[in-house]
């Protein structure tokens, strides 16, 4: 299995520019934890925290398979003051 390479930006329905996006690696995607203020992944012993703006986040996952790259868009849903990340990526 490859690694997830995730790109996000905080402007909905807009194409991210180089200044708006950050690229990082995570594995596996089911380790995602999200709150209203931080986005945390535990891909390694060094957990990374990324600031979030609730309701203003678009997250795209790129999964490399050989020479192909599949684009999977994940949605963060605001529920009871906390962001919920669906674990099913289809």
UniProtKB/Swiss-Prot annotation:
Glycans are attached at residue 80. It comes from the Eukaryota. Its main location: membrane. It is a single-pass membrane protein. The keyword Glycoprotein applies. It is found in: Membrane. Signal peptide: none annotated. GO terms for cellular component: membrane. Keywords: Glycoprotein, Membrane, Transmembrane, Transmembrane helix. Cluster 41 protein; part of the gene cluster 41 that mediates the biosynthesis of an extracellular and diffusible metabolite that is able to stimulate colony sclerotial production. This is Cluster 41 protein AFLA_114800.
């Amino acid at each position: 299995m490859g690694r997830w390479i995730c790109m996000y930006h905080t402007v909905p329905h807009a194409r991210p520019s180089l200044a708006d996006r950050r690229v990082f690696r995570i594995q596996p995607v089911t380790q995602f934890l999200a709150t209203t203020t931080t986005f945390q992944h535990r891909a390694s012993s060094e957990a990374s925290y990324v600031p979030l703006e609730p309701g203003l986040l678009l997250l795209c996952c790129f999964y490399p398979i050989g020479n192909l790259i599949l684009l999977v868009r994940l949605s963060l849903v605001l529920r009871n003051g906390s962001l919920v990340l669906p674990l099913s990526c289809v």
